[in-house]
């Protein structure tokens, strides 16, 4: 097991373990979540930094996949659904394809995906951060544009992963302040 994956697992286990007499694991995990969020975002950014240059060098397109409308959805009433759908999109569509583009980056993309899965798990445990059902038009537009780009879509989506992390941060900051 690689050190970043091991560290991620340790952070998750530490945040989930409840102290005796202090409520459920979920409750304790949720009270610590706002404090752990900066570390989780840093882990995502660190993992992305290992593949960023590769994908940005391969991304020859001038258009933007993750547009401002997606950030607006993250900040609006569809924020929960937009975040949930985008995490699912990256985990199920983008990253599996990205892993197959070069054996040298497969491990790093996998590590990035594991960090994103850990974030999703923590968000799901804390229902106030992900209590949603509606569909986001901005996410639908991202997915349609990604599909139209075919193989180049992977480069585009992965090269913009840092924008996605910033949008996650904006959403979570807004939710923590409310």
Curated annotation (Swiss-Prot):
Keyword Secreted carried by entry: yes
GO cellular component: extracellular space
A Pfam family of this chain: IL10
Gene Ontology biological process terms from the UniProt entry: immune response; negative regulation of B cell proliferation; negative regulation of cytokine production involved in immune response; negative regulation of inflammatory response; negative regulation of interleukin-6 production; negative regulation of membrane protein ectodomain proteolysis; positive regulation of B cell apoptotic process; positive regulation of cytokine production
Keywords: Cytokine, Disulfide bond, Glycoprotein, Secreted, Signal
Intrachain S-S bonds: 30-126, 80-132
Signal peptide extent: 1-18
Subcellular location, principal: secreted
Matching Gene3D superfamilies: 1.20.1250.10
GO molecular function: cytokine activity
Glycosylation sites: 134
Function: Major immune regulatory cytokine that acts on many cells of the immune system where it has profound anti-inflammatory functions, limiting excessive tissue disruption caused by inflammation. Mechanistically, IL10 binds to its heterotetrameric receptor comprising IL10RA and IL10RB leading to JAK1 and STAT2-mediated phosphorylation of STAT3. In turn, STAT3 translocates to the nucleus where it drives expression of anti-inflammatory mediators.
Assembly and oligomerization: Homodimer. Interacts with IL10RA and IL10RB.
Annotated family: Belongs to the IL-10 family.
Protein name, entry field: Interleukin-10
């Amino acid at each position: 097991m690689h050190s970043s994956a091991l560290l991620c697992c340790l952070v998750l286990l530490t945040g989930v373990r409840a102290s005796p007499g202090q409520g459920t694991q979920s409750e304790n995990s949720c009270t610590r979540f706002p404090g752990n969020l900066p570390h989780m975002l840093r882990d995502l950014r660190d993992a992305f930094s290992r593949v960023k240059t590769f994908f940005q060098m391969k991304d020859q397109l001038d258009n933007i996949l993750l547009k401002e409308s997606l950030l607006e959805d993250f900040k609006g009433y569809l924020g929960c659904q937009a975040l949930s759908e985008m995490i699912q999109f990256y985990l199920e569509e983008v990253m599996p394809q990205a892993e197959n583009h070069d054996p040298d980056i497969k491990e790093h993309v996998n590590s990035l995906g594991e960090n994103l899965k850990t974030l999703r798990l923590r968000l799901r445990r804390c229902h106030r951060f992900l209590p949603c059902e509606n569909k986001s038009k901005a996410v639908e537009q991202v997915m349609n544009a990604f599909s139209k780009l075919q193989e180049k879509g992977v480069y585009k989506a992965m090269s913009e992963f840092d924008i996605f992390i910033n949008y996650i941060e904006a959403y979570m900051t807004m939710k923590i302040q409310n």
